[in-house]
Amino acid sequence: MNIPETKLPRIVVIGGGFGGVAFIKNMQKEAVQIVLFDRHNYHTFQPLLYQVSSASLEPDSIAYPLRKIFRKSKGFHFRMAMVNRVDSEAKKVYSSIGELDYDYLVIATGTRTNFFGNENVQKYSMPMKTVPQALNIRSLILQNIEEADICADLNERKKYLTFVIAGGGPTGVEMAGALAEFRKSILHHDYPFISESEMEVHLIEGGDRLLSAMSKT
């Protein structure tokens, strides 16, 4: 793994998301060695993933190289790897590139998509937590529109142009708005044979209102 031995306390951080990055920034003035593990070598600004999915932004606009973020941080080391196991008694992490001892461990691996027990949503939908997932969604959206552009069967055409978003939280609302903006401002320019009214965007929420985590006022 090629991490230098040190007499300083070694802190291993698993996850280069908001929590992991914020923790490391707060520790930059401390006399410690920090080793960050993440499966990607970039930090993703997740609030803007929907703009990548809707083709409003390119991935490099929301992906920041982790090595660059901490380039001036002394005692910082990054390893792109998956951490498979933690032995808390032996104070050791086991990763896809080897094992490493630690003095302190920070687990900042983020969250997983919650399907709330809905098996159909889990089976047929595409989650949007990472840049690759956002690009997959973008690719499918544009592919469907291309298929609709050459489809003569109206029923099949309608299937290609119907988009369903599960979840009325901030990301779902923003994604629905981005697709609506695409339909209004871009669709007729790039696809003149598809009318705005043909493209449907459905936002599905299990609760009684959208943005339920936010104040009504």
What are these model-predicted stretches?
Residues 1-10, 76-166:
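FAD-binding core/adjacent interface of flavoenzyme oxidoreductases
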Residues 2-77, 84, 163-164, 170-214:
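Beta1-alpha1 glycine-rich phosphate/pyrophosphate-binding loop at the start
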Residues 217:
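Acidic, glycine-rich loop-and-beta core segments that form the ion-binding/anion-interacting portion
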